[in-house]
């Protein structure tokens, strides 16, 4: 089953995206055996990946994305994969999840910024207004 939905194939025409998404999924499933990145009951983790791709498709070009509480990298890491024109920052307070994000970003060659912090700690400051998209 293809990871990239057919309706997004024209939005993300890079032929290397599909194998990179598969590499991410393989890494996610491997790490998920050791740390809880996604529910172990999850039968189709690629659904989160596809949701992230739909999100990435509507973001304006050349912008900045700050994914607060990124966990396994949804949607931030996937957005960085699909949209190299964006500056992506991944904020995750759990060290073990940060280790996964570091490994994934390194293996996939993604120039993302990672912050191991809680927003409540005040380590993140907005320097300009932002559009907010929510999930969960």
Across the structure, where does each feature detected by a protein language model lie?
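Conserved SAM/SAH cofactor-binding pocket of Class I
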Residues: 53-136
């Amino acid at each position: 089953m293809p990871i990239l939905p057919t309706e997004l194939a024209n939005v993300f025409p890079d032929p290397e995206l599909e194998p990179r998404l598969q590499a991410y999924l393989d890494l996610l499933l491997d790490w998920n055996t050791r740390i809880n990145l996604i529910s172990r009951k999850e039968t189709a983790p690629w659904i989160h990946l596809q949701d992230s791709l739909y999100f990435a498709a509507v973001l304006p070009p050349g912008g900045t994305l700050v994914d607060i509480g990124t966990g396994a990298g949804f949607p931030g890491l996937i957005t960085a994969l699909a949209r190299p024109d964006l500056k992506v920052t991944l904020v995750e307070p759990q060290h073990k999840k940060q280790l996964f994000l570091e490994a994934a970003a390194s293996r996939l060659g993604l120039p993302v910024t990672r912050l191991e912090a809680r927003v409540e700690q005040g380590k993140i400051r907005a320097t300009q207004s932002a559009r907010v998209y929510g999930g969960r």
